[in-house]
Each structure stands twice: as structure tokens, then as C-alpha cells.
Regions:
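Multi-pass alpha-helical membrane architecture of UbiA-family
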Residues: 1-345
């Protein structure tokens, strides 16, 4: 392979990874480990970050593999339909990522094995069967965030000297389940026309954009409520920093969701895309709040600031091209209708 061909292939893989979503799920796993209040061995914390990240990457590869026929019609610029990434290569890369997840899970014991199996089943079930089946698909996808949090906790182990960590963990899992279900539903709003043409019976296709937006708002209210409960149940010494971070999260959520409400009758493609772009940053801040709840404000800021910056930079550099294709953003600005561009993030 020539140097140019190698660069082209590498770019196809990087596009498949969606770097603007990559930092989130590992931070969620790390947040779960922080909430456990167990022995914070560096290797355990690294595993709590690496295993969910490997599963996330595997999910992107397999999701693009299973969606290759739909993408050929609605997103031909993406790596597999454009021929820059062979479908078989994507399948093998997805399996390799799952193998890394399996290895780390086995090293962690039966708890992490169970969580990894559940996550792997959820990833495949969503991509292969559930994505086209309304709110059930969104709920399955949303559950993966909660499982990542649980995996991180099981990596370190719950301390018997701190039984109060269990209700905090459960409330936090509910918050991430509701949040990731909500953000996935915003993704479905972006692609109503493409999903309808491809036979995907998503919630916006079945019930329309106004109903889907109301569902998004209800799920976000559930997210904030569960996250607030988690903070009120946690150690009072770190509650102030957590609640301050949660206020930032709510402010970002308002910035993301207000345009959806304003345009719910006819959703322009860029409104939905920008809403999801803000949510991608907002959820990193949300995950960092739980890191701060367990480890303190110093480690939280040390992780959150560069991850938010990397997420924002990667979106500016890559997202419009990956979602809309070269030359399509200007077209999207000029039309009120949607271009097909949903992904699993």
C-alpha cells in the first residue's frame, strides 16, 4: 500500500471512530470507578476507562457494518459505502475491539464479565435489530451508558464500609440511561426522512417530530432529576462542586434543546445537528461531575477541560463532513428539510 493509500485508510478508520464522541464513554466508566470509593489503583482506573472505550469503538465499527446498505443510499460519503473501508475490515475491527473488552473484563472478574456481556449484547442488539424499532431502540442504546458506569464501579468494587454508594450509583445509572436515550432520540430526529425511506420505524417516523421533541424533554427532565438525587445522596463535602457542575450541564442542555422546541413542527437538519453537537459536549461535563463527586474537583477539572476541548475541536474539524458529506453543509443551510445523517452516538 502506498503512503497516500495508508493515509486514506487511516482517515477512514478515524472517521468511523467518531473522535468527537470517543472521550465520553471512558469518562463514564471512570466516573463509575470513582463512585465506588474503593482502592483507586491506577491500573484499575485505566481499565475502567479502556474497556468501555473499546466496546464503544467496536459498536461504531459493527454499527456501520450493519447499516452499510442503508448508508449506501443516504450517506454514501461514509467510509464503508464510499469504498474507503471494506465491510469485512469493519467487521473484523469491531470483533477485535470486543476482544479487548472481553480480555479486560475477564481480568476484572465475574462482575465485569457480566457487565461486558450485557454491553456487548446491547451493542449488537441495537445495531442489528432494535435501531429501527421506535423507542425500544433508543432505550437499548441509552442503557449502554448506564452499563459503562456500572462496569467502572465493578472494576474497582463497592466498599462494604460505604453502603451509601449503592443508591448514588443507582441514581447515576438512571441519569445516564435517560440522558443517552434522549441524545440518541435527538439523533433519530436528524434522520426522519432517511429512516422512513429505509424502512426504519423510529419514534420520529412513527409519531412525528413534535411528539419526539416532547419525549426528549421528558427524558432530559428525568436525567436532571436523577442526577440531582445522586448529588443529594452523596458525600456532603463534595456536593457543592457537583451541584455547580450540574448547573453548567443544565445550562448547556437548555442551549441544545431550546432550538428543537422552536423548530419542532419542521426540523431543519442543522438545528438537530447543532443540538446533538452541544449535547455531545454537555454529556462530557455531566460525566465529569460524577468523577468530581468521587475523586474531587482537582481530578475532575484535570480530565474535563482537555476532554471538552478535544470534543469541541474534533466536532469542528470532522463532524459536518462525516454527517453531511463534502459540500453538503451549504446545501443544508439553504433547505428546511432534513438530510440523512443519523449515527449511533
Amino acid at each position: 500500500m502506498s503512503a497516500a493509500g495508508a493515509v486514506r485508510a487511516l482517515r477512514a478508520h478515524v472517521e468511523t471512530w467518531r473522535p468527537y464522541t470517543l472521550w465520553y464513554v471512558g469518562l463514564v466508566g471512570l466516573a463509575g470507578a470513582a463512585l465506588a470509593d474503593g482502592p483507586y489503583h491506577p491500573w484499575l482506573l485505566l481499565s475502567a476507562w479502556a474497556a468501555p472505550t473499546a466496546g464503544w469503538l467496536g459498536g461504531h465499527y459493527l454499527g456501520d457494518y450493519f447499516d452499510r446498505d442503508l448508508d449506501a443510499g443516504s450517506k454514501p460519503h461514509r467510509p464503508i459505502p464510499s469504498g474507503r473501508l471494506a465491510a469485512r475490515t469493519a467487521l473484523w475491527c469491531g470483533c477485535a475491539c470486543f476482544a479487548v473488552l472481553a480480555l479486560l473484563a475477564v481480568l476484572g472478574g465475574w462482575g465485569t464479565i457480566s457487565a461486558a456481556v450485557l454491553a456487548g449484547f446491547g451493542i449488537v442488539a441495537y445495531s442489528r435489530w432494535c435501531k429501527a424499532r421506535g423507542i425500544a431502540g433508543n432505550l437499548v442504546r441509552g442503557a449502554l451508558g448506564a452499563i459503562a458506569l456500572l462496569y467502572g464501579t465493578l472494576t474497582v468494587g463497592l466498599s462494604p464500609q460505604r453502603p451509601s454508594a449503592v443508591p448514588v450509583l443507582l441514581a447515576s445509572m438512571l441519569a445516564f440511561w435517560a440522558h443517552d436515550t434522549m441524545s440518541n432520540l435527538v439523533g433519530a430526529l436528524r434522520d426522519m426522512d432517511g429512516d422512513r425511506a429505509g424502512g426504519y420505524r423510529t419514534l420520529p417516523v412513527r409519531r412525528g417530530a413534535p411528539f419526539a421533541v416532547r419525549t426528549v424533554l421528558a427524558l432530559y427532565a428525568g436525567t436532571v432529576t436523577a442526577a440531582l438525587v445522586a448529588g443529594l445522596l452523596a458525600d456532603p463535602a463534595r456536593r457543592a462542586g457537583y451541584l455547580a457542575t450540574l448547573a453548567v450541564v443544565v445550562a448547556l442542555g437548555g442551549v441544545a434543546l431550546a432550538p428543537l422546541v422552536a423548530h419542532r413542527a419542521d426540523m431543519p437538519v442543522l438545528v438537530a445537528l447543532r443540538a446533538h453537537a452541544v449535547l455531545v459536549v454537555e454529556r462530557v461535563v455531566l460525566a465529569s461531575a460524577l468523577v468530581g463527586l468521587g475523586l474531587g474537583i482537582g481530578p475532575q477539572l484535570l480530565l474535563a477541560v482537555p476532554m471538552v476541548a478535544l470534543t469541541w475541536w474534533a466536532q469542528r474539524m470532522m463532524r459536518a463532513g462525516h454527517e453531511l458529506g463534502t459540500g453538503r453543509p451549504a446545501l443544508a443551510l439553504a433547505t428546511p428539510r432534513r438530510a440523512a445523517m443519523e449515527d449511533v452516538s
